[in-house]
C-alpha cells in the first residue's frame, strides 16, 4: 500500500506530465485561459488516464507482450509492435464516449472545451501514460494508481496555470510578451517550482 501511495505522489508532483515531461502542451496552453474550462478539461484527462492506462496494461499483459499469448497456445508470438495503434484505439474510443456524454449531459462544458475535447485523443500526455506504464513494467494496480496520479498531476498543473493567467489579465504585461509569450515564461517558472519535488525520495 505504501508503494502505491508513493507512486501516486511521485506521478502527481515529482514526475508531473505537464511540468516535468512537458507532455500535452497543445491543450495545456490553449485551454488554460479560464479556470472553469481548465478544471473541466483536467477532470476529463483524469478520467481518460484512469481508464486507458489500466486497460492498455491488460491488453499489453495478455495480448501484446512477448509470450503473452501463451494462454492461447502461442508462446512464441510477440505482438508488441502493435502497441501504439492499440493504445491509440483505446484512447480514441474512450474519448468518443466521453464526448457524447458531455454533449448530452453537460453541454456548457462541451461547448467550452470545443475542439480540444476530441484532441485529447492525440494528447501526448495520455499516450505518454500508457507508454510509461509499459516501459516501467507496472502491474495492474500500479497502472490504476499511475493513470489516476498522472491525470491528476496534469489537471493540477493546467488549473494552476489558468488561475495565474486569469490574474495576469489585471497585470501590466509588456506588449511584446502579451499572450503566449508571458505564458511560456510562467510555465517555465512553474516547472522550476515543481523541480523542488525532485529531491523527495519515494
Curated annotation (Swiss-Prot):
NCBIfam families: nqrE (TIGR01940). One of its GO terms (biological process) is sodium ion transport. Keywords: Cell inner membrane, Cell membrane, Ion transport, Membrane, NAD, Sodium, Sodium transport, Translocase, Transmembrane, Transmembrane helix, Transport, Ubiquinone. GO terms for cellular component: Gram-negative-bacterium-type cell wall; plasma membrane. Pfam families: Rnf-Nqr. It comes from Teredinibacter turnerae (strain ATCC 39867 / T7901). The chain crosses the membrane at residues 11-31, 35-55, 81-101, 114-134, 144-164, 180-200. It comes from the Bacteria. Coiled coil: none annotated. It catalyses: a ubiquinone + n Na(+)(in) + NADH + H(+) = a ubiquinol + n Na(+)(out) + NAD(+). Belongs to the NqrDE/RnfAE family. NQR complex catalyzes the reduction of ubiquinone-1 to ubiquinol by two successive reactions, coupled with the transport of Na(+) ions from the cytoplasm to the periplasm. NqrA to NqrE are probably involved in the second step, the conversion of ubisemiquinone to ubiquinol. It is found in: Cell inner membrane. It is an enzyme of class 7 (translocase). GO terms for molecular function: oxidoreductase activity, acting on NAD(P)H, quinone or similar compound as acceptor. Composed of six subunits; NqrA, NqrB, NqrC, NqrD, NqrE and NqrF. It is a multi-pass membrane protein. InterPro entries: NqrDE/RnfAE, NqrDE/RnfAE_oxidrdctase, NqrE. This is Na(+)-translocating NADH-quinone reductase subunit E. Its EC number is 7.2.1.1. The gene is nqrE.
Amino acid at each position: 500500500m505504501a508503494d502505491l501511495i508513493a507512486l501516486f505522489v511521485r506521478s502527481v508532483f515529482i514526475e508531473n506530465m505537464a511540468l516535468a515531461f512537458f507532455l500535452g502542451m497543445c491543450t495545456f496552453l490553449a485551454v488554460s485561459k479560464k479556470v472553469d474550462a481548465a478544471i473541466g478539461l483536467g477532470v476529463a484527462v483524469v478520467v481518460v488516464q484512469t481508464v486507458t492506462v489500466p486497460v492498455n496494461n491488460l491488453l499489453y499483459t495478455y495480448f501484446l507482450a512477448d509470450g503473452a499469448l501463451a494462454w492461447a497456445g502461442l508462446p512464441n508470438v510477440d505482438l508488441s509492435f502493435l502497441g501504439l495503434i492499440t493504445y491509440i484505439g483505446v484512447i480514441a474510443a474512450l474519448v468518443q464516449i466521453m464526448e457524447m456524454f458531455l454533449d448530452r449531459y453537460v453541454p456548457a462544458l462541451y461547448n467550452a472545451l470545443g475542439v480540444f475535447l476530441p484532441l485529447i485523443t492525440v494528447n501526448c500526455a495520455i499516450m505518454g501514460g500508457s507508454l510509461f506504464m509499459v516501459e516501467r513494467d507496472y502491474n495492474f494496480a500500479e497502472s490504476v494508481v499511475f493513470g489516476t496520479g498522472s491525470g491528476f498531476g496534469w489537471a493540477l498543473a493546467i488549473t494552476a496555470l489558468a488561475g495565474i493567467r486569469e490574474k495576469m489579465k489585471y497585470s501590466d504585461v509588456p506588449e511584446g510578451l502579451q499572450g503566449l509569450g508571458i505564458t511560456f515564461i510562467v510555465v517555465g517558472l512553474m516547472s522550476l517550482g515543481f523541480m523542488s519535488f525532485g529531491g523527495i525520495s519515494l
